[in-house]
Structure formats: structure tokens, C-alpha cells
UniProtKB/Swiss-Prot annotation:
Source organism of this protein record: Nitrosopumilus maritimus (strain SCM1)
Pathway connected to this protein: Porphyrin-containing compound metabolism; protoporphyrin-IX biosynthesis; 5-aminolevulinate from L-glutamyl-tRNA(Glu): step 2/2
GO biological process: protoporphyrinogen IX biosynthetic process
One MF term in the entry's GO annotations: glutamate-1-semialdehyde 2,1-aminomutase activity
Family recorded in the similarity comment: Belongs to the class-III pyridoxal-phosphate-dependent aminotransferase family. HemL subfamily.
A GO term from the CC aspect: cytoplasm
Catalytic activities: (S)-4-amino-5-oxopentanoate = 5-aminolevulinate
Name of the featured protein: Glutamate-1-semialdehyde 2,1-aminomutase
Locations listed in the record: Cytoplasm
Gene3D superfamilies: Aspartate Aminotransferase, domain 1, Type I PLP-dependent aspartate aminotransferase-like (Major domain)
Amino acid sequence: MSNSKLFSDAKKVIPSGVNSPVRYFEPYPFFTKKANGAYIWDVDNRKLIDFCNGYGALLLGHRRKEIINSVSKQLTKGTLYCTPTEGETELAKLIIGNFPSIDKVRLMNTGGEATMTAIRLARGFTKKKKIIKFEGCYHGAHDSVLVKAGSGSAHNGISVSDGGLDEVSKNTLVVQYNNIEDLQKTIQKNKDIAGVIVEPILANMGLILPEKNFLSDLRKITKENNIPLIFDEVVTGFRVAPGGAQEHFGIKPDITTMAKALSNGFAISAVGGKKEIMDLLSPGGKVYQASTFAGNPISVSAAIASIKTINKLKNKLYSKLERFNLLFSTALDDMATDMGIPHQINFTASMFQIFFTNKPVTNYETSKKANAKKFQKLFRTLLKKGIFIAPSQFEVVFLSDAHTENDLNKTLDAYHLALKSVKN
């Protein structure tokens, strides 16, 4: 069946035809039948260079040999035990070894589950209610954080979701990213702050980087006020450095969440933090968290192989991706400048995004002012030329270890044509 026929069929049994909002784009999304390395193939047999990469999960590329071998071996032993396994402890030790801020780890399944638990831990630890989040930061689709969120929520213009409880969201205070004064004023006005949660690099409102001293000032202020600081490293964990953004910036949070690149494409997440906080989790403590699939041996085997591969490659991996990103982003900037197209390019590590605006993009408000229609034109032209990026300016373009210089050159040629379509 073709993409169009499959989508018509899907809409009959799946709301809007997709299982996550940002996967939809007009007139219909393509349906993937297989993937390998840096490429995916749709049901119409088009080969696409993949820069969506599972929205950042596939740091090592599709079907990475080390991970496939590890998972295949585990499949012969079973898929779900619902008992402790040796692999869970091995994985926890690997995570702790890469993240010095973490004393103990609890495994889960999704990024949203991890942030939900992190917030519950902060409330249990402080015995307070209110959480501070930043505009445009996306921490999953649960009520506590689905307020002025990024990702698909921003793309679809949903500031607060229908069905969410005001009684829950009223305990979420929203401040502007990269604005320390706004944070200080909010803390001064509210004495019931249980925690502050932040994406250290904002990767769900396009790509927005923390300004100089923002994260260090954030850490200082939360310490001075005895407020737990939660780093949501669901995207940045392992992607920007083996120890995530906290290694990259030299900041130690109290609680960390991670997922995505943790397992390179398998459903697993983790919450880690200081011993005195983590020991509050049940059954030893009174902060409840549970899941049938938490620590399942398939995902654990993938995560162990992923971290071991990352640790083995380390400088070689990250220096390659940073070099590719610098070359690509610089060339893209030159192209758009030569064409006279107002734009901003934000990039770091293995992530970048172009915004069609003449003003720096440093927060939620400036991101929303970028020309979304021009971005959609860019996206469609790239797709026609065999390049797949996320279909929203509020997402990020992700490089993987599977990408080659030839892939980048082909992609730059496609971006050149796409920018021409934007200009016209």
C-alpha cells in the first residue's frame, strides 16, 4: 500500500492517524518500512537521509551492530521477568559512572514517566507543592508540566491541554528561559517551591542555548534557597557528552532524568540523583513509583550496549559530530546570508536548527516569532529531495555517528534548493 492509502486506513482506527502529534504533517506523513545506519525507507521505496533520528534517540544511528547483537542475545533468554536482574545493576553503575551528580538510579520506560517521578521526588523531599518550569521547555505530556510547553504542544498551538486539571497546573509556575531575574522574582513571591525543572539545552522549541552564566546562576539560586534542581536530560543525556549537558557545562543538579540516547532507540528512561533524595522512592521510602516494564531486560541490554559503545568511542564520537555540525551549520549560514534570507542558526554538539527571523532566538517568545510557514516550505522541499528532518521548527535537527561527509554534502545541496524555495 502507498503512504496515502496507509494513512487513510490508519485514520479509521488511530486518532488523527498517528500515535504522537508531531509525526503528522500535511497532506499526510510517510510510513517507514525499514531503517539502517543514517537512512530510512518508506513504503513507496524512497530512501531518505534521516536527521530526525528518533527525535534525538539514535545518536549511534539505526540498527547499530553492538546494540542489535546485545538485544538479539537477550531475546534468546526472555523478554520480561518482573524480577531484579544483574543487568539492571550493571546499567545503574554505568549511568553513575558517567554522571557524577548521581548516587542512585531508578529505571523507567519513558521521558515523561521520568520527569513525573523526578517532580514527585522533589515534592516528597521538600514537603512543598509548587514546581517552577521554563517557557518552551517540554518535560512530557503529564499535567504538571504541560503548561506553555514545547515540542508538539507548541507546534499545534496548545498552551494548556484540554482535560488537564487546573488544580494541578496551578502548582506549576512558568518563568522565561534565559531570564534569571524572572526566576528570582518568582522564588521571592512563592515560599512553597518544591523544585525547579529545566532542559539545560532547550531542544523542544527548536534549539535554544543557555546564555552565559544562566545555568550556573540557576544552580547558585536554587542552592541558596534549598530548592532541588532537576535537569531534564531526556534529549541531552549522552547526546552532548558522555555525562550529558551537566558534564558539558560543569553543573551538578540534584536530580537528573534521561532517556532517548540512553538506549539508542529502545523504550527506557532513568531518574538519578543524590542518595538522600533517591532513597525516598518506594518500597524503602514513601514516594511511590512502579511500572511493569521498568528495567525490562530487552531495553536494559540495549542501554548497556549503547553506553559501553559511547564510552569506548568517547572523544572520537563527539569530536566527529561537533566537527560535522560546525561545518554544516556554517555552510548553511553562508547560504542563507548569500540569498538575503533573514535567519538565525542555533547549534551545539550534534544538534542544530534554523529559524527564519532576523532576531536572535533565546527563549519561547523569540522562537514563536520565527516564520513557521517558511520552515514548512523548507521541510517539504527537503523531503522531496530525500532529506528527513522533524516537520516542525520547534524540534531539532540531529546528527548521528552513522552520518558521513557524503551524507552532509547531499544534505547541503538539498538545503540550498530548499532555501531557494523559501526565498521565492
